[in-house]
Amino acid sequence: MSEKKRRGGAGAGAASGSASKKPRVSTAASYAESLRSKLRPDASILATLRSLASACSKSKPAGSSSSSSSASKALAAEDDPAASYIVVADQDSASVTSRINRLVLAAARSILSGRGFSFAVPSRAASNQVYLPDLDRIVLVRRESARPFANVATARKATITARVLSLVHAVLRRGIHVTKRDLFYTDVKLFGDQAQSDAVLDDVSCMLGCTRSSLHVVASEKGVVVGRLTFADDGDRIDCTRMGVGGKAIPPNIDRVSGIESDALFILLVEKDAAFMRLAEDRFYNRFPCIILTAKGQPDVATRLFLRRLKVELKLPVLALVDSDPYGLKILSVYMCGSKNMSYDSANLTTPDIKWLGVRPSDLDKYRVPEQCRLPMTDHDIKVGKELLEEDFVKQNEGWVKELETMLRTRQKAEIQALSSFGFQYLTEVYLPLKLQQQDWI
């Protein structure tokens, strides 16, 4: 063999070795296209989805086991001072105003007797927010702290609490709803910033034992929904198949939603608006009957309430599509077992048994996502990932642990949009159909 050929052969071998470590886009694209040929007819995938939906409709609600049932009964006794955890419930306006009146009268009597006044507020400190395996959600331990109008350090917080109680009382008496922003702007100088009024609003919910929606104070619209769903919004009939690419805004007043109907086989929960728009424009819900919703990032209260209500009333499985990074998993965990800042209302805000469809860390190699479409994890990403591994609700799911360990080992993350490197419609035409066909969720 000539020296030239030997050099050429060595060079080719080196190039081949390099390619095996980092697939060229053309190689990855070729493999991605080969996956398309593995797709079975839609009728076969639909049969799989019907079986999943049927099994979900027959299964007992999460937390209905004997141990969870007894725990739920104990928690439901919201007026029982011996109850270990706080549970709030929806209440009508008359009940909430009556409770506010009793608080104010007690404060007035205390002042007239010369003792001053103090609010007994459930402590929402981090140490009181715990994950309860039997209920599969984060709950708030029942511990109270005093908020007296006694000195400079406590008087301002007590004043803000009294002001919020007064504003909520006025809103309920008028029978209207206001946003958290509206509430803040009623007394900007007192509140200082909206974080103050928002935090006290949560305190008031705990004090009164009611959900925040019972206070008639809501967040601005954020989440959207599209797909095989119809419902009445304050009497107006909404057809979510006719909402266009942007979808229908999820109403902030979930109590005004009624008449929910659907022929969907599953609910697809999407982390980001970009993926939602792709799914909506391609009318993915017509090919595979589903309801698609997103909170466009961090889950807001209205979207969490709406998702839970759809799950409970329609008895459909929920599949989640999030970024392959620690924050995608954190967002998924908020939907499933709640957030710590609203742990007092986790019974109403959580949707257990959401199945993690993608994009999972193991998918990056399985679907040969090109290296240039992956991102290196930052030190902060790694820190968040390690913290997640220590969370009890993560330890309960072996699949989550394995995926997180894969992410931390490879130190790589990727957004849902990384799949667009194979084509803008690869998500809807290949990736998701193949995932559904293979029942590839955890």
UniProtKB/Swiss-Prot annotation:
Tissue specificity, per the record, is:
Highly expressed in flowers before pollination. Expressed in roots and shoots.
Q: Region labeled Disordered — which residues? A: 1-34
- Tell me, in one coarse class, where this protein mainly resides: nucleus
Cofactor(s), names only, from the UniProt record: Mg(2+)
What terms describe the molecular function in GO for this protein?
ATP binding; DNA binding; DNA topoisomerase type II (double strand cut, ATP-hydrolyzing) activity; magnesium ion binding
Q: Which residues take part in binding Mg(2+)?
A: 271, 323
Q: Where is the active site?
A: 185
The EC designation for this entry is 5.6.2.2
User: Where in or outside the cell?
Assistant: Nucleus
Cellular component terms per the entry's GO annotation:
DNA topoisomerase type II (double strand cut, ATP-hydrolyzing) complex; nuclear chromosome
> What induces its synthesis?
By auxin, abscisic acid (ABA) and benzylaminopurine.
EC primary class: isomerase
Where is the Topo IIA-type catalytic domain positioned along the sequence? 91-224
Similarity comment: family membership: Belongs to the TOP6A family.
Question: What job does the chain carry out?
Answer: Component of the DNA topoisomerase VI involved in chromatin organization and progression of endoreduplication cycles. Relaxes both positive and negative superturns and exhibits a strong decatenase activity. May be involved in cell proliferation and stress tolerance.
| Quaternary structure and partners | Homodimer. Heterotetramer of two TOP6A and two TOP6B subunits. Interacts with TOP6B.
The protein depicted here goes by the name DNA topoisomerase 6 subunit A3
Q: Which gene encodes it?
A: TOP6A3
